[in-house]
Amino acid sequence: MAVLFLASMLAIVSAKAETRELPSKKAPLIVETLATGLNQPWSVEALPDGAYLVSEKGGTLRLVRGHHISAPISGVPEVATTGQGGLLDIALAPDFAKSRTLYLTYSARGDGGSGTAVAKAKLSVDGTKLEDTTRIFLMSRLTPRGQHFGSRIAITKDGSLFFGIGDRGESERAQDPRDHAGAILHINPDGSPHADNPFLGSPDGLAEIWSKGHRNPQGLAI
């Protein structure tokens, strides 16, 4: 699965449509171009029907089906595109085939600057819009800095979300348990802290934090 996902990512950003083999001692790798003409694609998520959702850093979400790229999907939250910020990861809820629910990470504006946020939404049946889009999480201590937003999402069997936030360009923040920066966080589908988190109910750290000390986590898998 990881190899196939990597191949898909490489294909999305390829300059021209082609299928080619890459030499490897461990396993055969085939890279197939799925689409061209995307603008800074950041994340690719496969849908049950074989299509792909692709986030573009500038704040656009598109559906790729076959070799066709859709018009921008409406209903995407507004993003802050400062520096490395923008529309980031996409993850489907475990029951997506029935509920059409998905999650997005992105950089959001707020008092003091911007920071990593998580939104929950439903993809319309025709794939043209997000419905009921709601921000369920926004990190603490926003800053005008444009570095290290993270972020990847990994969803567990119970539907809860792990996701990463970078240190926002200030390494000392990754060592502060009262700061969401530089952390892996674990939340429920409604944005509340997960019951297994180490600082839940403690004054020593923020309840959403699962682990600290991460510079800019952009890979996460369960």
Short names for language-model regions:
Residues I165-D167, N188, H214:
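Short, structured patches in soluble enzyme cores that scaffold and shape functional sites
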Residues A2-A11:
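Bacterial N-terminal signal peptides
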Residues A154-S160, H186-A195:
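A structural motif
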Residues A117-D126, P177-D190:
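Beta-propeller blade signature
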Residues R168, P189-G205:
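Short pre-catalytic segments that frame enzyme active sites
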Residues G205-I222:
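Repeat-solenoid scaffold signature
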Residues A15-E172, G219-I222:
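Acidic, Gly/Ser/Thr-rich repeat motifs that build Ca2+-stabilized beta-propeller blades
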